[in-house]
Amino acid sequence: IKNTLKNIEISQLKTDLIDSKKEDFQIIGKSSQMQKIFKDIGKISTNDHTVLIRGESGTGKELIAKAIHLNSSNSNGNYVQVNITAIPSELLESELFGYEKGAFTGAEKRKIGRFEEANNGTILLDEIGDMSLDLQSKLLRVLEEKKFYRLGSQKPTSFNSRIIASTNKSLELLVKKNEFRDDLFFRLNTLTVDLPALKDRKSDLPLLLNFFNEKYVGLNGQIKSFDEDVLNIFAKYDWPGNVRE
């Protein structure tokens, strides 16, 4: 457990705790679907309510979460991303809330959790639909009371960051199957962003192709442009992996 915790701590701190001002990313699209997304980001960024981002894998949920953070009043705070599916369920609670020295075997010193790292910033809970029911109840308590407890501590820690949750599943269906708490769903469902699949906004394909071409191979002069035949082939493809593919 000790080694697993250490590996998770090192890898996630390297990849997930982001200095937003230095983050280099772009959201590409001029389609009507993406124009609506941009408007949604603008409206959502004016407040600090909880946000739920829904969309298939590869549609850019993480980018949207970062954009909301960057345009919000807490943009100077940390942006922390937690992939629920990447952390073993038995370790997720200590990863989110942190723990005190001696809280369990292997806890040799206090560890700050992900909620605490996001102080005055934003935390993205990626793939919230995979969170256990037990942990869902504790997340609900954080949303209601604006505080949490490190494992092994009786002293509450204040929570003053924005929570953004993302999912590629239907939380409504999970609620009906008693696999997701309805009260937590209502808390998360305050503001929503629904991302379209790439097959539903193929008019953005030329923009995306040019963007990735310039980013990855254009600097070497390997590809100047795409032939019409190539564009037609891409347009006929349904891109099941979406923009990530």
Predicted regions and their residues:
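Small-residue (primarily alanine) positions within well-ordered alpha-helices
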Residues: 45, 65, 118, 165-166, ...
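Nucleotide-binding/hydrolysis machinery
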Residues: 5, 11, 30-33, 72-77, ...
